[in-house]
Amino acid sequence: PRSTLFPYTTLFRSLARMEQLRDEAAHGGKQAVLCGDFNIAHTPLDIKNAKANETHAGFLPEERAYVDKWLGELEFVDVMRDLAGNIQGPYTWWSQRGRAFDNNVGWRIDYQFATPELAETACGFVIDKAPTYDLRWSDHAPLSIMYDI
C-alpha cells in the first residue's frame, strides 16, 4: 500500500534535507533533537501485535526502513529506546477502537531522535499516559525526555 497524498519517496527525500541540517548543526558545534509523531512503529518491540500488523500502514517494511535510515545513515539515536532497553513498549498511541487503551494494546510511534552527543546526556524519560481512557485528552501520550545539559 502506498499513499497517493504523501508517497514514501517524499519521506526518503526528506532525509537528504535532515542530513544537511544535521551537518550544519555539527559544523556549528551544536546538537539536535527531532521529536514528534512519526506514525511508524519501528520494531516489534514498538507495537503490541507486530505479526498481525505487518501489512498495515504504520508497520510496513518500507516505513520501518525509513526509520532505519534515521538511526543508521543519519546516525541519530532513538533516545527513549536507548534509555528503556529492549523491552516491549512502552507505547505512545492507542487505537480508539475496542479497549486498546485499557488493555495497553498500543504502538510506540512518537519519538525523540537525537544526535549521539546529545543522546548521551539523556537521563530519563516519561510517557504521560492518562490513568484511564476517560481522562485522556488525545489518542497519544506525550513523550518527555530529560537531558542533563
Predicted regions and their residues:
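A long, amphipathic alpha-helix that forms part
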Residues: 12-29
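Acidic/histidine-rich, metal-coordinating catalytic segments
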Residues: 30-44
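Metal-dependent phosphoester-hydrolase catalytic domains
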Residues: 44-149
